[in-house]
Amino acid sequence: MMDSQLHIASVLLDIEAVKLQPDKPFTWASGWKSPIYCDNRKTLSYPAARKTIQDEFARQIRDKYPDTEVIAGVATGAIALGVLVAQELNLPFIYVRSSAKKHGLGNQVEGAWTPGQKVVIIEDLVSTGGSSLAAAQALKEAGLDISGMMAIFTYGFTIARENFKKAEIELTTLSDYSTLIQQAANSDFISQEHVNILEEWRKAPSKWGVK
């Protein structure tokens, strides 16, 4: 585990972009009961956190994908993030809608690019990977060459790892679930009892809390 992952986890906890409530679970749109809720859009409201995340994305892209020609953000949560990263790297920016527009040009990918250009996709959060990989497919169909996808955070679900492996797309995240739980425990955000609950949830999230 890198120190940068712990630092990003600390940032997310400090601004409450990630909330941990093992005793008062959240209900996701999917219907799952969850002891964690992640809203990385909050990072945009805190200049120091925003700059930290922007700089870490840019640093890792320079290291991992030095030939990147375009940055793509996944709508809507990663559009602003993607713009920040593209500006830092002095690269063009495009974004991907969840579906093609029903009017006008009917675009799903917005912006200017040339087929064959190498693109890195920016996401705010990866859960199962379904919507993220749908965006990647749209970029492929638009003729772009996907170098990889980067996200602020992932829950680390097995299904997500399997989905990305099947799609043959490399996923890199600035922090992850295990790191965040460790940081939360180290910083006394949660007790060891809560750590155990959070670890159990991740093993079978769809069944957790079901009576």
Where are these regions (language model features)?
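Active-site-facing substrate-recognition patch
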Residues: 1-64
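Phosphate/pyrophosphate-binding loops at sites that engage ATP/ADP/AMP, CoA/4′-phosphopantetheine
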Residues: 57-69, 139-142
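PRPP-dependent phosphoribosyltransferase catalytic core
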Residues: 3-14, 137-211
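Solvent-exposed alpha-helices and their adjacent loops that cap or buttress functional pockets
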Residues: 64, 111-115, 142-143, 163
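Conserved acidic residues
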Residues: 69, 117, 147
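Short glycine-rich phosphate-binding loop at a beta-alpha junction
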Residues: 66-75, 150
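Short, glycine/charge-rich flexible loops or terminal/linker lids adjacent to PRPP-binding catalytic cores
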Residues: 82-120, 128-134
